[in-house]
Design a protein with these regions (language model features):
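Feature captures the catalytic cores and cofactor-binding loops of soluble hydro-lyases/lyases
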Residues: 1-144, 161-164
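Mixed-charge, glycine-accented linear interaction segment located at domain edges/termini
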Residues: 143, 147-158
Length: 164
């Protein structure tokens, strides 16, 4: 699928319905795919990546996993093992409102990864969190089933597919 977030923004800049949204430019690129898109699945967790692991171990089917880590910079929610699982299981990308680790390994994975920062400290494993719930990422509503488009210029969301 070919797209450019700038073109999507040009086409939808007057959409005041809330169906088209743009995440703030705070996410860094860590993955092996500079551009990715797909329907959204959601994990909400705080410094515990147990549900992230469960998600990426399941078939991704071209989806994008949005991880609401509350913007925490204290623990890494995704590392090399989880990124490799995401690539192996067909996830298009991961957007983490939090940290990642194993940066060289992430870059080698064929999956898009955006996150706030790198942090070498791993998470706790308490099986806490929620899946497939609406979340607020950096002040922007993200819902399961939204479409997410990410490239070098940014990340946009829509309630419906915008490509094709």
């Amino acid at each position: 699928m070919r797209f450019a977030t700038c073109d999507l923004c040009d086409a939808h800049k007057n959409d005041l319905s809330g169906d088209f949204r743009v995440l703030p430019p705070v996410f860094r690129d860590f993955g092996g795919r500079p551009a990715f898109a797909g329907p959204v699945a959601v994990v909400k967790c705080h410094e515990d990546n147990s549900l992230v692991k469960d998600a990426v171990d399941s078939p991704g089917q071209g989806r994008v996993l949005v991880v609401d880590g509350g913007g925490s910079l204290r623990r890494a929610l995704v590392g090399g093992n989880l990124a490799a699982a995401a690539a192996r299981n067909g996830w298009a990308g991961l957007v983490v409102d939090g940290c990642v680790r194993d940066v060289a390994e992430l870059r080698a994975c064929d999956v898009g990864i955006r996150a706030l920062a790198a942090m070498p400290l791993p998470t706790e494993k308490r099986q806490q969190g929620q899946r497939d719930v609406p979340v607020w990422i950096q002040g922007v509503l993200v819902q399961p089933g939204d479409w997410l488009y990410a490239d070098e210029d940014g990340i946009v969301l829509s309630r419906r597919p915008l490509h094709g």
